[in-house]
Amino acid sequence: MLYVPPGGSPRRLLLMLHGAGGTGRRSLRLVMAAADAASCAVLAPDSRGPTWDAVPGRFGPDVRFIESALAGVLPEGAGASPLAVAGFSDGATYALALGRANGQFFSHILAFSPGFLIPTHPTGSPGIFVSHGRSDQVLPIETCSRVLVPELRHDGYQVRYREFDGRHEVPLAVAREAMDWFADSLGQPESPRLQ
């Protein structure tokens, strides 16, 4: 599903990945208001299975589907630089893996309540935004973001980390903060060829 904000040509593109058992349409609702404010188009695909294929252990058909969806969108002018991959819950875990493995293509990663870091062969150095609710009972902050953010920083990534009073969710204020951080950046992505 492709969402283009009203009132003109979007200046950037966000690939938004849903949580386990979710849909692209539901994940789009998490960031739509923030995308409107930032003049950002959002591509929100559905995973090929109940969750993204790298979460069980390795990349598979979801990567090829995402690559095809991006190739179909970018030539039509909906995408602009920079390009970010984002996700919520399992989608955030997948976004961190996909974005780090394709850092030459994705300039930014936005991870809302990720679970863990999937081992990958990183390329490039995308900026990373991570948010997590202190009362998250689905993916507890103590064993998730408070562990993976220091690991990302140790690996040399610039990480903006935002804890908030809340549960397993993406509050509008957090979505806007993440989108503003992304919107303030410049850069040219390369052609869409994912690892």
PLM-predicted stretches and their roles:
Residues 1-4, 10-78:
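Serine-hydrolase catalytic machinery in alpha/beta-hydrolase-like enzymes
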Residues 12, 126-127:
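Alpha/beta-hydrolase fold active-site loops
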Residues 18-20, 74, 78, 88, ...:
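Cell-envelope and extracellular/periplasmic
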Residues 25, 57-64, 100, 139-142, ...:
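Soluble non-cytosolic domains of exported or imported proteins
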Residues 25-32, 69, 112-121, 142, ...:
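Alpha-helical scaffolding within the catalytic cores
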Residues 81-125:
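Primarily recognizes the serine-hydrolase "nucleophile elbow" in alpha/beta-hydrolase
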Residues 129-131, 137-138, 142-195:
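C-terminal catalytic histidine-bearing segment of alpha/beta-hydrolase fold enzymes
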